[in-house]
Amino acid sequence: MCIRDRLYLIRAPEMTDVQHIYDRVAKIAEGAALMTETTVECRFDKACSSYLPNRTLENAMYRALSHFGTPEWNSEELAFAKQIQATLTSNDRQNSLNNIAATGGENGKAYALRHRETVLANEVAPYAATENVLAASTDVGDVSWKLPVAQCFSPCFAVGTPLHTWQLVSQGRTSIAHKGMLLAAKTMAATTLNLFIDSGLLQECQQEHQQVTDTQPYHCPIPKKVTPSPLK
């Protein structure tokens, strides 16, 4: 008996699209099995939901981030980041600035123009509530459909550094990354503190979340029949 395995990861901007594509892929597999007089079994591996933004909470987090501002970089950090930038292409830098421009509205475009030669971020990028899809991984997609969630970006590497590269890994244990993560931690802590202090803000976040989920209820993307599989 000959057995062949194939693993497919299906992604789309919305979960409804993912489900439609998954159903179609399953039918294609079933059709191929019929044509070749073989059998097929679809084994569900994993799934996660898209991120649901909460604009009220995002604004609160942005105010906290703006209060702290970007880290103070010393000469050694700037010199090292400049060495990293020297290994990047012009497209790498431009793609990084384009992402900022796409998520910051008109102010984001102006910010990108101002920082074409910046080595390490020295100004908080503008915030704008946009519907642009950011293709990135997150662990809080499903959580965001159960309660209000906000996310922020923090400067942990030289401007223009592409993700999943040796350049990013090289900066991961530097003081640059440590300062960036400390800023993120302070921002999250301050945002949480403000929610404890301002019950009205918390209520606004909850009301916004309720309004969205009333029309788009959460459905766990993992079928109920699926159980944890043995470790391989």
List the model feature ranges, each with a label.
Residues 4-232:
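Metal-dependent amide/peptide-bond hydrolase catalytic core
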Residues 1:
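Conserved phosphate-interacting/catalytic interface
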